[in-house]
Amino acid sequence: MANAKDLKVTLVRSLNGRLKAHIACVRGLGVRRIHSPVVVKDTPENRGMINKVSYMLKVEEA
């Protein structure tokens, strides 16, 4: 199950018209569709991708 070192990431804005690098970050996190949450580990790599596209995501502790 999820523990304190997991993050629940949800895409809340569309990827249409975004930079290719930002789309790659969202895909790298495993998010596929708007409003479908994904649980990822809280690592520096994932935090970096989340920070880069934070304007499109909602992040909660899982």
Curated annotation (Swiss-Prot):
Annotated organism of origin: Thioalkalivibrio sulfidiphilus (strain HL-EbGR7)
Protein name: Large ribosomal subunit protein uL30
Any single GO CC term annotated in Swiss-Prot or TrEMBL for this entry: cytosolic large ribosomal subunit
Pfam families given in the database record: Ribosomal_L30
Family listed: Belongs to the universal ribosomal protein uL30 family.
Gene Ontology process terms (BP): translation
Subunit structure: Part of the 50S ribosomal subunit.
GO function term, MF aspect, one: structural constituent of ribosome
Entry-linked InterPro entries: Ribo_uL30_ferredoxin-like_sf (IPR036919), Ribosomal_uL30_bac-type (IPR005996), Ribosomal_uL30_ferredoxin-like (IPR016082)
Signal peptide: none
Domain of life: Bacteria
Keywords: Ribonucleoprotein, Ribosomal protein
